[in-house]
UniProtKB/Swiss-Prot annotation:
Pfam families given in the database record: Acylphosphatase (PF00708)
Gene behind this protein: acyP
Record organism: Chromohalobacter salexigens (strain ATCC BAA-138 / DSM 3043 / CIP 106854 / NCIMB 13768 / 1H11)
Catalytic residue list: 20, 38
Domain Acylphosphatase-like: 5-90
Enzyme class: hydrolase
GO MF terms, alphabetically ordered: acylphosphatase activity
Listed name of the protein: Acylphosphatase
Similarity field: Belongs to the acylphosphatase family.
TM stretches of this protein: none
PROSITE patterns tied to this protein: ACYLPHOSPHATASE_1 (PS00150), ACYLPHOSPHATASE_2 (PS00151), ACYLPHOSPHATASE_3 (PS51160)
Keyword tags: Hydrolase
EC numbers for this chain: 3.6.1.7
Length: 90
């Protein structure tokens, strides 16, 4: 069940450091669906859909990221996107 969908844009050293794959791992562990994809401006866009507490847990992790990353900002907004059935990398 998807209580909530949230879209996040993560800024910093987040491309080429395993950020999307680590985000997928965190999301799947939390039971959250969505996607993570690189943007041309160097950010990563993340869609998270799931129980509110699980989405919040992954958002908190986005501020940390995997060891090779350096997150400087995470911007979030509620999303109206239809919830996907899995977590995809783009």
């Amino acid at each position: 069940m998807h209580d909530r969908c949230l879209k996040a844009w993560v800024t910093g050293r987040v491309q080429g450091v395993g950020f999307r794959a680590a985000t997928r791992d965190q999301a799947l562990t939390a039971g959250v669906t969505g996607y993570a994809r690189n943007l041309p401006d160097g950010r990563v866009e993340v869609l998270l859909c799931g129980e509110s507490s699980a989405v919040d847990r992954v958002v908190r992790w986005l501020w940390q990221g995997p060891p090779a990353s350096r997150v400087t900002h995470v911007e979030c907004e509620q999303a109206e996107d239809p919830p996907p059935g899995t977590f995809e990398l783009g």
